Amino acid sequence: MVPGIDRLLAATPVRFLAARAIWWPAQRTLFVADVHLGKAETFSALGVPVPAGATRSTLQRLIALVDACDAGTLVILGDLLHARAAHSDAVLGPLESALRRRPALRVCLVRGNHDDRAGDPPEALGIEMLDDAHRMGPFELWHHPTDRERGRDPLGAAAPERPDSGHRLAGHLHPAVRLRGRASQGVRLPCFCICAHQTILPAFGDFTGAASIERVPGETLLAIADDRLFELSDR
């Protein structure tokens, strides 16, 4: 089993993985967010210098994690593809090959803002397309989180309080926390943001960037350093 930190979300045992994913063992389901396949190729086509091989290494990490967990379902919480330019043989060919070799794997994608611009993946890939608020057990699957401080949705409206609403799993923010040491030195680490009503996952992709956040009261951050997780909370 892939090492990580075991916690309860909505009274459900899950494991937070330093590989930037959440594992739900009872349902053999792996959650990731913000994969952004094809981002490097998109930037390169615009003449922007980018690291070579980012899409390949991201896909390799994702498939290796699926295999290590023996996942039956892979849920991507938005932004699988970065832009329409990602609909190329160079990007989709390796993805199609990996999925073809794993016919029993169910792959679900919650449409994110980049997916809206890129367009849905080809039907031949067999990826199930989901809209925001899709319910999976005790969880609601979203791309955008609610406002972490005020419990509001990304457009500024009050977050709905429904008696049947589940614990929201979301991405989009690419959250990272800055840890400061001596002599004003610091390091920025990707992190999970966990509170009573939602969990925000860090970006899975290798070439995605990150947004520095500050922990808000009542929230736990799980920072990722290499293959280790560190908890930052009120305790």
Regions found by a protein language model. Give the residues of each.
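Extended recognition/assembly regions associated with phosphoester-bond processing machinery
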Residues: M1-L77, H82-R235
